A protein has these predicted regions:
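Alpha/beta enzyme core
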Residues: 1-174
Length: 174
């Protein structure tokens, strides 16, 4: 892992994240990954090594235990992942409610700052698909620094723009 991270740094990367992550997997498959040494602990180890190498670290965490592990590993930013992003044409269907997200994000935040009071905590994923959703959670959480966008920043806006543009072309009268 150290060699791989050094190569990334040498070609200009300044930070890393544990994605894809086993944190999105549950059930027997997750148990099998953990039992065979390919679980979340490997992701924690990668974050620890990356931090030692002075790379910026922004790991996804899914619960208090994982948050504490990543905080102990020295993560710069803890991204509380509340599930695959919903909305859009390929968004996940199964998701927490916004109020459930508030609870999870706050619990993880409270736990990780006990390990490292300086850590930055962001929320991400699940029903947090638009600015209003992120605002809802952020206004109800204490000490959470912001929102970490992925699909909500790159996939969803493109889908909206493509649909609108296609609609306008379809309106052309011949």
């Amino acid at each position: 892992m150290r060699t791989f991270l050094r190569q990334l740094r040498d070609i200009g990367f300044v930070g890393v994240q544990n994605f894809p992550t086993v944190g999105l997997i549950d059930g027997n498959f997750r148990a099998n990954l953990e039992e065979t040494g390919m679980g979340y602990e490997k992701e924690v180890e990668m974050i620890r090594i990356a931090r030692e190498m002075d790379l910026v670290t922004t790991p996804y965490v899914f619960n208090v235990k994982e948050g504490e592990m990543m905080a102990r590993a020295g993560a710069d930013v803890i991204v509380v992942h509340v599930g695959l992003t919903t909305s859009g044409t390929i968004g996940a269907q199964t998701a927490l409610t916004l109020d459930e997200c508030v609870k999870v994000v706050q619990e993880v935040r409270d736990a990780v700052v006990k390990v490292n009071p300086e850590v930055i905590v962001l929320c991400h994923g699940g029903p947090l698909a638009g600015p209003e959703d992120a605002e809802y959670v952020l206004k109800r959480c204490q000490g959470v620094h912001g929102f970490f966008g992925a699909s909500s920043m790159e996939r969803l806006p493109v889908e909206v723009a493509l649909e609108e543009n296609a609609r306008r072309f379809k309106e052309i009268q011949l």
